[in-house]
UniProtKB/Swiss-Prot annotation:
Keyword set includes Cell cycle: no
Organism name: Thiobacillus denitrificans (strain ATCC 25259 / T1)
GO MF annotation, one: acyl-phosphate glycerol-3-phosphate acyltransferase activity
Name of the protein in question: Glycerol-3-phosphate acyltransferase
Gene giving rise to this polypeptide: plsY
SMART domains cross-referenced by the UniProt entry: G3P_acyltransf
EC number: 2.3.1.275
Subcellular location: Cell inner membrane
Record GO cellular component, one term: plasma membrane
UniProt xrefs under InterPro entries: G3P_acylTferase_PlsY
Enzyme class: transferase
HAMAP family for the chain: PlsY (MF_01043)
Signal peptide: none
């Protein structure tokens, strides 16, 4: 029962869409109604409100981090195996993609995935963050940066953590992230993908 409660709690935490929450609090339009239609920091940035985008980014990353850290602490307290931590990581990520509180219209998961990876292993998170930043600085395209990072994240996980359940979890998260970017892939191929910071 405790396993189910932790997984459900992680999913509900992941379902907090900070793009929508922050936008409402700051009197901005719903990020699902303009730009890419994605409730994420990049789309919030298209309003020109950098503070809102930063708060969205931090909130989405923090919930992924908290889900893993809290699950790890409770697992130790109740003598649960480490698999529950990985299940909670996946549950939080899926919650972000399909949030029950917002009609299952979630984001693409980049910030939440980063928070999860940092919690699983700081070096893994740092490697992925460095990859995203490097790609963003060179190409100025958020989706391309995310896709390249998603492809490399399981490789980083295997090298840093070993080819184990943790690496498999990272692979699943990466595959889900790529799936959520399927529309962006077409835009990248046709040269229609928007650049970071472009106003809607």
């Amino acid at each position: 029962m405790i396993h189910l409660l932790l997984v459900v709690a992680a999913y509900l935490l992941g379902s907090l869409s900070f793009a929508v929450i922050v936008s409402r609090a700051m009197g901005l339009p719903d990020p699902r109604s303009f730009g890419s239609g994605n409730p994420g920091a990049t789309n919030v940035l298209r309003t020109g409100r950098k503070t809102a985008a930063i708060l969205t980014l931090l909130g989405d990353a923090l919930k992924g981090w908290v889900a893993v850290v809290a699950a790890r602490g409770l697992a130790a307290q109740f003598g649960l195996d480490d698999d529950i931590v990985l299940l909670c990581a996946l549950a939080a990520f899926i919650g972000h993609l399909f949030p029950v509180f917002f009609g299952f219209q979630g984001g693409k998961g980049v910030a939440t995935a980063l928070g999860i990876l940092v919690a699983l292993d700081p070096w893994l998170g740092l490697a992925c963050l460095a990859t995203w930043v490097a790609m963003a600085l060179v190409f100025r395209i958020s989706s391309l940066s995310a896709l390249v990072t998603a492809v490399l994240a399981p490789v980083y996980a295997g090298l840093l953590l070993g080819w184990n359940d943790s690496a498999t979890t990272v692979l699943v998260i990466a595959l889900l992230l790529v799936y959520r970017h399927k529309a962006n892939l077409l835009k990248l191929v046709t040269g229609q993908e928007a650049r970071i910071g472009k106003r809607s």
